[in-house]
Amino acid sequence: MFLIVVPLFLVILVGYCYGRTKPDSGNADKLINDYVLYIALPALLFIAVARADTSDLKQWGFMLSTLIGIAVSYMLAALLAKRVGIGLPHSSLLSMGASYGTTGYMGVPILISVYGEQAALPAAIATILHNIPAIMAVIVSWDVFSTRAIGANTRLIHSVGRSALTTVKNPLTIAVLAGLAFVLLDIQVPVVIESFARFLGNAAGPTALFALGLGLARLKVKEHLNVTVSKIVLPIVVLKLVIQPAVTFAIAVYVFGMDGYQGVWLATAVVMAAQPIGAGVYVFAKKYHYQPDVIALSIIISLLLALVTIPAVLSLFPPS
């Protein structure tokens, strides 16, 4: 398992080294990230879902264990934030950090590299499940608790609608929904479109990991490291890398009875839950001007620790 995973992390290392040696390559970084987010990954997720059978989508244990794992980490982070005097809406960002991972950029390519094409569909579904709840919770929290407009109910409805629109407009969400439409309407994907999507999707894995390395090279640990920040960061990282996958595994196996015959689905649920903190949390921290240093440090530490924790998690689910 270690030998399977090493090349994946070497691609991240190559991206990191390139980013460090080319500090002025900001436009190139953006183009690579845009290619991954708007073209390669959506193509991969679309074809994975579009070629599925409706029976493949009825993985209720997989979906519920994933969502419960997210919810538990989110709520524990909220309790931690409250304990140190951080309330809503600010605590929603810390909760997002404890439950939102790099499922697209890192989780998808790792799963497909280790388990093959059979992991593409569960990885696509998991990506959406991990994106929607945390993003919506942050947007709603900041809209409702940080404004003083008249009419709380109207404000809440507007906020929920806006957050739903934001998540639906995500290219990865659009790709999965488009693929789902083909399945539900029983439409055969034309050969040309399938070949085109596969050709683009084949580049998603290495390009996404390279882009992840580039992003890591742009984050500066020393600027964010201090004792106060570390007291918040470390529990968040533990929640993300340890508690969330542990809860997901426990619910999947002991509540929903997922076992060997659902091996890839079980592995996907746990591996996706074990992903390091996603860069999207930093985007929201910058947007709302709340402790981007805490989030940046959390992302860096979780990524570094993931070099050890993800291979450990994968070793529990060896490919058949």
Question: Would you name each region that the model predicts?
Answer:
Residues 1-320:
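Alpha-helical transmembrane segments of multi-pass small-molecule/ion transporters
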